[in-house]
Amino acid sequence: LRNNIISHATGATGMGLGFKESSDSDVENNEVIYCAIGVGSDLSPFEPDTTIRFKNNRFAFNGIAIRFTSELGGNILTNNIFEGNLTDVVQMGRGVADKNQWHGNYFADYQGFDRNADGVGDTPYELYSYADQIWIETPTAQFFKTSPVLELLDFLERLAPFSSPEMQLRDPAPRFAKPDRTA
């Protein structure tokens, strides 16, 4: 799946791209913009020892940029742009963040530095879910996702965690500056 602009899938079940029991696929040079869920991946990759490769895509202004709903892993995500999404990535299973490979992606909310000016952040990008676990585990609570109560709960959870946050992803070499998509 290459060189597409996918946008405005905003209904209750709106999904830009959906993978169900898919294997050995390439998703490259696409723009997934303004969707309820940019990419939904369920039991994908399905076949053992295969991968789904996401490369040079832009995920912008989605409710959830990528939602993985299985614990299989096997996705490789490199050189993608994540900007302006309410939530960049959701892993529905517990303890599965290390089963997908992340490398060289740009995250608009990365808070690290690039002291040696090589274009790569000095510290890994790690995304944790704190109060988000409420709506991840109880999907009907997603209606309240940006409400003041859940935002306050998320702030308090980060300040003084009363439960262990769940790691959603770890990119050991995040891009520090947003790459130019026209090149």
Predicted regions and their residues:
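Membrane-proximal low-complexity regions enriched in glycine and acidic/polar residues
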Residues: I52, A60-F61, A65-R67, G74, ...
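Short polar/acidic secondary-structure junctions
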Residues: V32, S44-F46
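All-beta strand scaffolds that present successive hydrophobic residues in beta-strands
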Residues: L1-N3, D24-E28, D49-N56, L72-N79, ...
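Short coil-to-beta transitions that initiate beta-strands within beta-rich domains
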Residues: H8-G14, E47-T50
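Acidic, glycine- and Ser/Thr-rich low-complexity intrinsically disordered tracts
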Residues: L72-A183
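Short glycine/acidic-rich loop motifs that flank beta-strands on beta-rich extracellular proteins
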Residues: T10-L17, A36-D42, G63-T69, L86-M92, ...
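Consensus "Asn ladder" position of solenoid repeat domains
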Residues: N4, A9, N30, C35, ...
